Amino acid sequence: MAYKSQHGVDDMVMLSKIANDSILDNLKKRYGGDVIYTYIGNVLISVNPFKQIKNLYSERNLLEYRGKFRYELPPHAYAVADDMYRSMYAEGQSQCVIISGESGAGKTEAAKLIMQYIAAVSGKGADVSRVKDVILESNPLLEAFGNAKTLRNNNSSRFGKYMEVQFNGIGDPEGGRVTNYLLEKSRVVYQTKGERNFHIFYQLLSGANQQLKSELRLDTPDKFNYLSASGCYTVDGVDDSGEFQDVCKAMKVIGLTDSEQKEVFRLVAAILYLGNVGFKNNAKDEAAIDQQSKKALENFAFLMQTDVSSCEKALCFRTISTGTQGRSARVSTYACPQNSEGAYYSRDALAKALYSRLFDWIVGRVNSALGYKQNSQSLMIGILDIYGFEIFEKNGFEQMVINYVNERLQQIFIELTLKTEQEEYFNEGIQWEQIDYFNNKICCDLIESKKPAGILTILDDVCNFPKGDDQKFLDRLKESFSSHAHFQSAAQSSSSFTIKHYAGDVEYCAEGFVDKNKDLLFNDLVELAACTTSKLIPQLFPEINCEKDKRKPTTAGFKIKESIGALVKALSACTPHYIRCIKPNGNKRANDFDTSLVMHQVKYLGLLENVRIRRAGYAYRQTYDKFFYRYRVCCKETWPNWTGGFESGVETILKSMDLEPKQYSKGKTKIFIRAPETVFNLEELRERKVFTYANKLQRFFLRFTLMSYYYSIQKGAADSMKSNKERRRLSIERPYQGDYINYRENFELKDIVKKNGNEKIMFTHAVNKYDRRSRCQRRVLLLSDTAIYFIATEKNKDKEDRKKRPWIYVQKRRLLLAGITSVELSKLSDGFVVLKTMNEHDQIFECRRKTEFLGTLIKAYKTGTLRINYNNSIGVAIKASKQGGKGKERIILFEKGIKPGESVFKGTKVSTPSDGLPADTVPNLTPPESLPVVSIPIYKPAMNAKNAPQNSGGPASNVKPSAKALYDFDAESSMELSFKEGDILTVLDQSSGDWWDAELKGRRGKVPSNYLQLIKNAAPPRAGGPPVPTGNRAPTTTTTSGGSTRGGFNNGPSTAPSGRGAAPPSSRGGMAPRGGSVAPPSSRGGIAPRGGIAPRGGMAPRGGMAPRV
């Protein structure tokens, strides 16, 4: 059923009026009702609520979205995640989600929700859990080192991140990697008033224990220049101390040892002390360490694990080489002193280099923990969380690069959702009216173009000249773009320029562009890393151990263009999904909707054009062959055989759905469907059909496996008892079921078993257990592959809990199978069993299904061969006292009684029934047949085939077989048919296994097949049905498909009671026909015995009662 919203419309394609005002009003109405998600087709719009909304992200709500179609539940990030996850396997195509929006719109939180959902719905194996833990725990770690408080966002990502998660063939994550883009390392040395440095600095100072603070010589944030300049140390609602503990936990998850963690924190502290190092010029105008910062330099050297003099030299001097390097050339090297300005530049360059390389090292360790598989054919889900569009009072090189990246992402959105969609309609010959939209490619070219040179190319050219500076760069821009529509130069005296971005006009200050683009780090600073005894720092500077690269170093602008180009290539290889984030106000306040700010975002995000195209266009398109192969199962004309073409097959499928021609259009190579509901209906129908066919296969193989399993148990028990013990009449022919207490639905019993590990329950039954005074006590017996449980039902002593559960299960005894020395039974037809143990008292109990219990115990016993003794005088070591222990041995005597019925236990004597069958009575067991192998031809349609589907052959014979009733049968429901022994029934259908459709005197109904004997020379069953055995044995053995055997027993010439050849099969509470493993299929398509262990559409029962297939 489709979900209906009470707050506006869920999908803005359904708006009655298509205008920006209508979009704004709908978003405002939903925001006021705490409904922050809205669709435009398959694009999710997310408005940051700046507060926690109750139950929106609860575990229960997350699981609600699993396997649901988009229209069934309210819009949500979980719905996008589920669509990605399912589409990945349905289409065999990697997926990605592009999360965009300006800073503070909620992109990082949306990315975390996608990862949270994928982790929750995938598998739980050891290796899978490891990968999921790394995926989830990498978030707080990367946020600590890569996020910061800005004026617009308390948790602003100051780097770009693209996380790729690899999946194996069953949908579980098996690896992944994180690619990071352009960390804003300038934030390490400078922050605007009211902003903070990266979170990790404050977390370390606040959350480190006293020992770590002492080791790292930490102080309060206001004592460090790199933190105090902005005047902001805390964030409302953020616990830096608690988040530091999360960071430490995340470090352990990704595999960082305690010593490596300490090395990381040591380097973070070193950067803080580096910022406290000050300089002044001496008489020669040379930089020298300020006396007041000598202590800071000492602390920096201590934390860097090097000497003070090396640090001072690296900061105050710059090594210059002259001459041409070569074997015969003379090279002169000079240590030139810098002035204080140059020293400050070197200090900040070193701080930025140390931090950015530490961040890259952490990302590398995350990737090592994820274990990305190179050259793998695995499908992937990519999650892009990158810095949002930024406009500040003063915008520099970093803001231009960030906004350039957002321009490229907007271009991808335009290319894939607006431009490409309209071009596809034209190329496929679909009638379409062109819709205009703003294409920001002109702005992207302005920044990145090579020919003619764009802004970044010009900046690189200026950096190549020794005398290139910011003013030269600005002059080149004015010269090149004076007439460009998206570039505007300021007044002649100003050092700024303006770019007209898709999100608005941004004025950039050219000051610092050249230096930041060069991104230089002098060799003196690199060589300082070679002097340290730290194990971490040399890993951050691999150039220490490499030969000097004579090539010119790449610029920051070149690197970002290269990395964004690679990102676009990776995104283009995936099926994209979109989350467009909107910030409702600039004050980070809940319940505050700034109409003008939101309208600005609605316009520059192009939501109106997106609505128009989605409304006028088609929600779904697919090539004919892929559509046909996916949905052919939905139509009886195309399944299982179709010899027509793909296009005609697709049209046949759609006609079977009663679709009107206007609801879809046929292109040259693709089918286009207008309404998403049509596709949802197709998917639902396909799921039902596939489920039905899969269950038919599962039922067949499960039936065969169960028959093999129970045959081995029956044979084991029969071989043991043959000639050793009299048999009860109902025991000899009773089919086995395994579970007689509905264990698979009893979660309290399951909880008791779970306490001892992952045990597989193989047999359950209610038994009579006898204590040391021969008193009978009712118990539940559970036999697992490891132990035997005896569980009592007692009154609940907890007064509060008693209202809900007046009775509870209490484990009284657990016998390990390895501790059982032998099993003792009498030679008579009773149901008593004695379990003898090594060091504990013996256990005596009575079980109505002791034969099945014994056969299952033989199969489960792994410690050699189980000893089974038969004797009418059995010694039982009784319990010494209430505290336990092995007491005296008591002899129990078994005597045959004079009446049929149940056994009677009094004192030390057991009186058994008088009507037991002889000990040589054995069941008539036939081993299951081998699984049949059938070759089925595969029909592959040709694109232009004109021949019709082939005829499947003539109809089967209409002559119905007859069967003779061997026993009386009384119907218990209107669907069943009663009959008497000797009646002749017409068998209408044998396809349901143990329950056949039959007719008697004009009445029709279900009848148990093992109450009947097919009459010889009767018509055969339907084509492909099971063979009918012949013979005059009474009762007969019938073989069902899969090798199921059913029948009576062969007890020799003197065992048949007068008047009847054999007793009727157990029809109440047994395994077949009314409770067997081969029973009428349930409504879910599984094998559903009445009161048995029926799997719900699966291969094995949930309780673990059946063997694993």
UniProtKB/Swiss-Prot annotation:
Record region (Actin-binding): 564-586
Domain TH1: 725-919
Positions bound to ATP: 101-108
Gene Ontology process terms (BP): actin filament organization; actin filament polymerization; chemotaxis to cAMP; endocytosis; phagocytosis, engulfment
Domain spans labelled Myosin motor: 7-687
Start-end of Low complexity biased regions: 1030-1043
UniProt entry keywords in alphabetical sequence: Actin-binding, ATP-binding, Cell projection, Chemotaxis, Cytoplasm, Motor protein, Myosin, Nucleotide-binding, Phagocytosis, SH3 domain
Main location: other
Disordered as annotated region, ranges: 1017-1109
Matching PANTHER family: MYOSIN, MYOSIN ID HEAVY CHAIN
Assembly and interaction partners: Myosin I heavy chain is single-headed. Dimer of a heavy and a light chain. Inability to self-assemble into filaments.
Protein name per its UniProtKB record: Myosin ID heavy chain
